[in-house]
């Protein structure tokens, strides 16, 4: 009976330690990956439409864009303290600045004890990025009733151990057509709604935690999947070959995190990460300029939100 109680206590204690370890790894993953999800929301909502004017029924515009999102210092590091963790500690210190996915290398080491056995692992290194460039093509088609549909798609590409794929669809409807005596060079007003899907994965130096001779957790990759909606009001004014436009909008983003690797705790960790993402709502403002040369248009737009993003586009109207 006594031996049975000891075995039960030992099993319960091991389960408790593993649950606490999962909570600690959730915090590390959240701090590391959240800035990437936020930056993805800003980039995916940029460059959809650069004019409130009607493109024209069944007219087609082919464009190539480049986004550059600027990463502030506050999004490159995250302060961590021993009091934030359950069984993990920062080796040799009570707190440390840890890199996010955009931060640089770090010499911070975590240590802890699981089922009576000590373990340690290096904190995850970041990409050391202050600017993230994202090019993409887009096709826009004019529909009846002053409406346009835009499509963009980028297959998965890997740059510096980061894989990215994006796709999306956007709709714009011109409301100036309902104004009496409205002309194309008058003040234009439109509403925009878009949907984007983004997949990001980042491979890093593996983290391994073992106890009682078995691998408890191995992590070597973080995956971020995002579904992002944009609702935006767009205004523009044409002055000859030059056009000014501005927009105010809101993004609603659903993020899904998961970790790649192995070990007995990985399924539990990913289940908890799946519940961690949730919905994030952000406001954003755009200001931009267009220059028309025949059937070509050069657009530039600047977005202010949780990040600052610049978009440059070259458009050709058929």
Located regions from the model:
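Outer-membrane beta-barrel biogenesis signature
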Residues: 14-110, 184
């Amino acid at each position: 009976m006594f031996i049975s109680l000891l075995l039960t206590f030992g099993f319960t204690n091991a389960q408790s330690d593993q649950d606490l370890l999962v909570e600690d790894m959730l915090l590390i993953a959240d701090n590391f990956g959240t800035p990437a999800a936020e930056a993805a929301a800003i980039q995916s909502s940029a460059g959809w439409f650069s004019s409130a004017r009607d493109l024209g029924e069944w007219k087609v515009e082919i464009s190539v864009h480049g986004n550059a999102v600027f990463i502030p210092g506050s999004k490159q590091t995250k302060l961590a303290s021993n009091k934030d963790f359950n069984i993990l500690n920062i080796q040799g210190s009570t707190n440390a600045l840890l890199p996010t996915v955009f931060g640089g290398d770090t010499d911070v080491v975590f240590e802890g004890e699981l089922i009576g056995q000590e373990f340690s692992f290096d904190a995850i290194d970041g990409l050391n990025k202050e600017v993230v460039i994202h090019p993409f093509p887009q096709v826009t088609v004019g529909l009846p009733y002053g409406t346009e549909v835009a499509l963009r798609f980028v297959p998965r590409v890997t740059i510096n151990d980061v894989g990215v794929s994006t796709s999306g669809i956007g709709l714009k409807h011109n409301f100036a057509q309902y104004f009496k005596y409205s002309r194309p060079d008058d003040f234009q007003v439109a509403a925009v709604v878009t949907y984007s899907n983004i997949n990001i994965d980042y491979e890093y130096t593996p983290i391994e935690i073992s106890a009682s001779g078995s691998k408890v957790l191995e992590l070597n990759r973080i995956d971020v999947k995002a579904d992002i909606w944009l609702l935006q009001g767009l205004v523009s004014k044409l002055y000859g070959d030059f056009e000014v436009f501005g927009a105010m909008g809101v993004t609603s983003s659903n993020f899904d995190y998961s970790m790649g690797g192995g070990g007995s705790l990985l399924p539990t960790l990913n289940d908890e990460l799946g519940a961690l993402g949730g919905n994030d709502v952000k406001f954003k403002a755009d200001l931009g300029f267009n220059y028309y040369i025949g059937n070509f248009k050069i657009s530039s737009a600047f977005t202010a939100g949780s990040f600052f993003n610049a978009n440059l586009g070259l458009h050709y109207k058929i």
